[in-house]
Amino acid sequence: MDPRPPVVRDQDRIDVRLTGEAEYLIPFTFIEALNEGTLFDRPAHAFLDAAREHRLFQVVNQTTDNIIGTGIIQGSGDERSTKRAEVGGLMFHPAARGFGLCSLLVKIMMVYAIKESGRDSPDEEYLAHVVDGNGLPLHSLLEAGFRPIGPVDVHRGDIDAVIDYMIKGGESVVHMHGFVFDREAIRKLVSSLWRFVNEDHGVITRSDPAGDVRLTVDFSQVIPPTDLKI
């Protein structure tokens, strides 16, 4: 008999948190363990840098104190030109999927990055890349205000990550679908998060043949409720 509790259970409480420097290895090892070959293999120092810049997020089941999801905003590009940041590392434990937690996390990440972090600049582009055949993040990105920019070939060195295992035989690039965040969508995201907190009371439900599973999500450590002004 497995003594470990289920990843999520009915009535569990879920926290979305910024990851501190001392904890950066938690999301790093989480992704390392669960990566299905669809995410960039980012080095540990990329997670440390993101933690220092308050751009590393983790989703934790407060009831069991176990991590169930991650997200990272990784700086890239030449500081002398248009700044770019890669939104990725979106990974949820398979047993925590189907609730809409990934969509919610991306919304929180983008509202925090643009309105709360103090690091955003109007010329910064937030990009996301999804490898061919990986449909899981598409809905989450579109719901969170990203728009498709078409096929993108990612070469070695384009991002601080190992991509060799994603390159198909005989090729030198990874074929991906590109997305860019539409800054005009930020008001809609704030409104969506306000409704989630004030009308849905932070509760999300996944229908299950064995009975509905209800989770209460709190992201006030990242975005105070008073900052969700519409």
Stretches found by the model and what they are:
Residues 123-138, 153-159:
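Conserved beta-strand-loop-alpha-helix junction that forms the acyl-donor binding cleft
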Residues 64-70, 85:
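Glycine-rich phosphate/pyrophosphate-binding loop shared by adenosine-nucleotide-utilizing enzymes
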Residues 154-230:
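C-terminal "cap" of GNAT-fold acetyltransferases
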Residues 142-152:
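Conserved acetyl-CoA-binding loop of GNAT-fold acetyltransferases
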Residues 92, 98-115, 139, 143:
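Conserved acetyl-CoA-binding loop-helix of GNAT-fold acetyltransferases
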Residues 74, 81-94, 129:
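Conserved acetyl-CoA binding element of GNAT-fold acetyltransferases
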Residues 2-42:
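Short amphipathic alpha-helix that is part of the acyltransferase structural core
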Residues 32-63, 72:
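Active-site rim helix/loop that mediates acceptor-substrate recognition in acyltransferases
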